UniProtKB/Swiss-Prot annotation:
GO biological process, alphabetically ordered: signal transduction
GO MF entries: GTPase activator activity
TM annotation in the entry: 8-28
Biased composition (Acidic residues): 140-189, 493-520
Protein's name in the database: Rho GTPase-activating protein gacV
Taxonomic source organism: Dictyostelium discoideum
Residue segments, region Disordered: 33-73, 121-189, 348-373, 489-520
Function: Rho GTPase-activating protein involved in the signal transduction pathway.
Site feature (Arginine finger) residues: R246
Annotated keywords: Coiled coil, GTPase activation, Membrane, Transmembrane, Transmembrane helix
Domain (Rho-GAP) ranges: 195-472
Length: 520
């Protein structure tokens, strides 16, 4: 805008100069024309005066005429000289004016040329500016097009990336769904019964890792199903139920719970404590590898032989036992038959006279008192020989449960003592040797981890008779855990007493301080 305004001012200035030149030239021409007219008028007047004087001289004297003529001639000469001078002046002025006109014209031409040059330069500048603007616009348009193209390419890349991510996410979702389905299928196929303790614990640890729980609680060292069954028996007042583990629950329901599983948070669980006690025995009995491994059987037998431990059913009632087993011959489930057989054995023991029982108990107590420390150490060593930590943890968990159950105040209610409980648990803890040998030789078509259900009861009398030493060891094991629980209770009681004494001492000290403060 500033360049355009300056150019306009210059053009107006040049136009003004040109108009002034034309005005000056017009004025000079008018002056020249007016001077020419004056000269003509003077000449006419002189002519008229000469004529009038000539006429007068003709009438006067001749000398006057001559003088007049001389004067006239002199005047004429003067006039001519004057006219010549005036003419020269006029010519000079005309030449000067022409020079000035030529100078003005030249200046005008120069100015016009300058104006043209300036206009041309301005046009060139404008053209250059327009060209530059066009180039800039083209560059901007090209850059914008490139940016748009880049944005389009980036959008396409993003869309491709998003599509790839969506495909990957879809694949991950599908893989996750497949894994979830596989896990669900595995969970559906995975049973808590008839499965090794190691596999149960691996599955449980995997679940804990998936949930992100790093802390290892005491209850998580054993299978959840075991902890639940033990807690369920306690919560249903099992320790206040007479005949616990001797009286069977609903056997069909036990089999159904073991086969189909159960929801521990359901409100429709069976409230009968005997059902859960039977389910616990079945879980122990169905373990592929017994809770006390087979390789420890020779050590256990040597332990029972060297310590003269005998805690079997009364041999005088063998015939009655055989007759009673024949009553159960129609039952196909070995677990149920074993439970019934232990009931018969316990009933026979209860029918023995009190004198024989007292004598046996006194003898056992004497032997236990004499060899208590050595037997306790040997049992501890045998338990420590179990290589699997998971097996040891499960054995201690079950032992702690039965140790609490065998406390004197509980035995008075349940009527289940160490002797009767050892006979109930032995068939579940120790699989009979003849069946184990048949399994190892492949002579029985079992599943490999459970005793076949089609096995009849005809072999049970001989099986139980062969487990006398195992029953004796289980009796020692139960006494061991009973004493351990008693020690634990005693420690807790001592700790509580110590805490109470400390509280009393603290209270007395506080009272003494208050008394001192009051006295002061």
């Amino acid at each position: 805008m500033s360049n355009n305004s300056n150019n306009n001012i210059k053009t107006y200035y040049i136009i003004g100069i040109i108009t002034l030149i034309f005005i000056v030239s017009a004025v000079i021409k008018n002056q020249l024309s007016s001077s020419n007219q004056e000269q003509q008028e003077e000449e006419e007047e002189t002519d008229s005066m000469g004529k009038s004087k000539g006429r007068g001289n003709k009438k006067g004297k001749k000398p006057e005429k001559i003088q007049e003529k001389k004067l006239d001639n002199h005047l004429k000469n003067l006039e001519k000289v004057k006219l010549q001078e005036d003419f020269k002046l006029q010519q000079d002025e005309k030449q000067q004016l022409k020079k000035e006109e030529t100078i003005l014209v030249e200046k005008q031409e120069i100015v016009v040329d300058e104006l043209k040059n300036k206009k041309d330069e301005e046009k060139q500048q404008q053209q250059q500016e327009e060209d530059q603007q066009q180039q800039q616009q083209q560059q901007q348009e090209e850059e914008e097009e490139e940016e748009e193209q880049q944005e389009i390419e980036e959008d396409e890349e993003e869309e491709e990336g998003q599509e790839q991510e969506e495909e990957e996410e879809q694949q991950e979702i599908e893989e996750g769904e497949e894994e979830q389905q596989e896990e669900e299928q595995e969970e559906e196929q995975f049973s808590m019964f008839g499965v090794s303790i190691e596999r149960l614990m691996d599955f449980q640890r995997q679940e804990d890792e998936n949930e992100g729980s790093d802390e290892v609680e005491e209850s998580s060292k054993v299978p959840i199903v075991l902890s639940f069954m033990l807690d369920r028996i306690k919560n249903l007042n099992g320790f206040k139920t007479e005949g616990l583990f001797r009286v069977n629950g609903n056997l069909k329901l036990v089999e159904q719970l073991a086969t189909e599983g159960f929801d521990p948070f359901s409100d429709d669980l069976d409230p009968n404590v005997n059902t859960w006690a039977s389910l616990l025995k079945k879980w122990i009995r169905d373990l592929p590898e017994p809770l006390i491994p087979h390789e420890l059987n020779p050590i256990i037998l040597d332990f029972c032989t060297n310590n003269n431990i005998n805690n079997t059913c009364n041999n005088n009632n063998d015939n009655n036992n055989n007759n009673n087993f024949n009553v159960c011959a129609s039952t196909n489930n070995l677990g149920n038959v074993l439970n019934l057989s232990t009931n018969i054995c316990n009933n026979n023991n209860n029918n023995n006279n009190n004198n024989n029982n007292n004598n046996n108990n006194n003898n056992n107590n004497d032997n236990n008192n004499n060899n208590n420390e050595s037997i306790e150490k040997k049992i501890t060593n045998i338990i420590n020989m179990i290589k699997s930590d998971d097996h040891r943890n499960v054995l201690y968990k079950i032992g702690e449960f039965f140790g609490e159950m065998l406390q004197e105040e509980t035995v008075l209610i349940t009527k289940i003592n160490v002797e009767s409980l050892s006979k109930i648990l032995t068939p579940s803890l120790f699989k009979p040797n003849n069946i184990i040998d048949d399994f190892s030789n492949g002579s029985l078509n079992g599943s490999g981890n459970q005793i076949p259900k089609y096995l009849t009861t005809l072999d049970l009398p001989s099986i139980l008779l062969k487990q006398k030493k195992e029953i004796a060891f289980v009796s020692c094991l139960l006494n061991y855990f009973k004493d351990e629980y008693s020690k634990k209770l005693q420690e807790q009681n001592d700790q509580e007493e110590d805490n109470q004494e400390e509280e009393k001492d603290n209270q007395e000290e506080d009272e003494d301080e208050e008394d001192k403060d009051q006295e002061e």
